[in-house]
Amino acid sequence: MLKTCRGFSLFMNWFNGICAVVCGGWMMLSALVDLPLSWNDWMPLSIYDPFPFHDVFFTSHFWPGLALLLVNGVSNVVALVLRRKGEAEWHRACLVAGILLLCWTITELLIIPNGMSLFYFVLGILQTAAAAVLMKNAVRRTA
């Protein structure tokens, strides 16, 4: 069980760290320059219409891309870096990354429900649960 939790946590750190940084960066770049394959080709800006302040923060994909990069990308990259510092720091960072993913996807599911957000919501539950199991085991070992 612990090996599975460690493996899944590590997978999520790499997967979300890479995907959120790449996709967030692509979204931001698509807002700034004309790309041959732009984020605008995948997702129209009208998808943001249900969000509060959509006419301020969602006039391009820049701010959503920056938020994705910072919230989901950086939190998982930090967790990967902290893995070298020690298990306790890594477990806490994995828990924070999982909770942030849950908050992100819950917001998306409430405002713009879609299958991809549901998929990431399940991943967020699993990431948070895996980190909680690892933290509980670490506390048990030190007690």
Question: Where in the sequence are the language-model features?
Answer:
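Topology signature of small-to-medium multi-pass alpha-helical membrane proteins
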Residues: M1-A143
